[in-house]
Amino acid sequence: MDEKKRKVTVVGAGAVGSTFAYALAQSGYADEIAITDMNKNFAEGQALDLVQGLPFLPQVDIHAGDKTDYADSDIVVVTAGAKQQSGETRIDLLKRNASIITGIAKDIAESGCSGVMLIVSNPVDILTRAALKASGWERGRVIGSGTVLDTARFRYTLSKECGVDARNIHGYILGEHGDSEFAAWSMTSVAGRRIDEYCSGGVCSSGPHFDKAKILEEVRNSAYHIIDYKGSTYFAVGLALTRIAGAILRNEHSILSVSMTLDGEFGLKDVCLSVPCIVGRSGAERVIESDLPADEQAALEASAKRLKEAFTEMN
């Protein structure tokens, strides 16, 4: 008996969508990757460029697709969005993107898809909440990429400070994927030791009292620096999305800081932001709650307030 194919549909064939498709194809996590775009010829070109590398990849079926691919997809990854036009305000751009994302979300829901919707388009927290509302799905099945990449940047930055492999740094960036995000230092550890304790032995490059504010600033601003250098970010984004997709397709129950609409967790409700979640086949299956210290709880609440205000303004 044939096993069910693990299928991912990518909506939006631009730099982020195509880089994700490329990284996913190399990972071996998916058996089928459909690439869709408003510009069908562009999607065809991206798919053709990828399939010609199939002799170098794990077995995978890559093709250009359309809305009919949603129905049997395990994950639909939405990277589509409008670019800001000259003279267009931030809120007008947000409204245009919300219209695009809600339209896609409705199409996915109406297709009968039983999988997970992963929103990547920015501002990801607001658009994920809009997509959830449009879809009518349960909240764990409509998630955003959130601060998974920000968390990777945080771990990388700390690895330079501590002289330890980034994969052995444990910690999270939480809240908004944006300027109000914060580092959950209370959750940050190396080899089971709190980061402050680990660095107190003088093993970190800045000594026992490293500059936490400077590290957070570096994490927050890293995307801006890359944009200054090359115009946009997509390599690390593609890898972060592949990590999330792998957790879903392989039912890993990994703990990732995806963006999810909260329903009382951390004392917050009706807001979508990044917190540690168990991610498996059905999406974000559970939020991992913890008692945050007062300053981190205040930062989370400030992030939630900012996002709620933006969502209200958009509507």
UniProtKB/Swiss-Prot annotation:
One of its GO terms (biological process) is lactate metabolic process. Keywords: Allosteric enzyme, Cytoplasm, NAD, Oxidoreductase, Phosphoprotein. Its EC number is 1.1.1.27. NAD(+) binds at residues 16, 37, 81-82, 120-122, 145. Transmembrane segments: none annotated. The keyword NAD applies. HAMAP family: Lactate_dehydrog (MF_00488). The active site is at residue 177. It comes from the Bacteria. Allosterically activated by fructose 1,6-bisphosphate (FBP). It catalyses: (S)-lactate + NAD(+) = pyruvate + NADH + H(+). Signal peptide: none annotated. Pathway: Fermentation; pyruvate fermentation to lactate; (S)-lactate from pyruvate: step 1/1. Beta-D-fructose 1,6-bisphosphate binds at residues 155, 170. Belongs to the LDH/MDH superfamily. LDH family. Homotetramer. PROSITE patterns: L_LDH. Substrate binds at residues 84, 90, 122-125, 150-153, 233. Its main location: cytoplasm. GO terms for cellular component: cytoplasm. This is L-lactate dehydrogenase. One of its GO terms (molecular function) is L-lactate dehydrogenase activity. Catalyzes the conversion of lactate to pyruvate. It is found in: Cytoplasm.
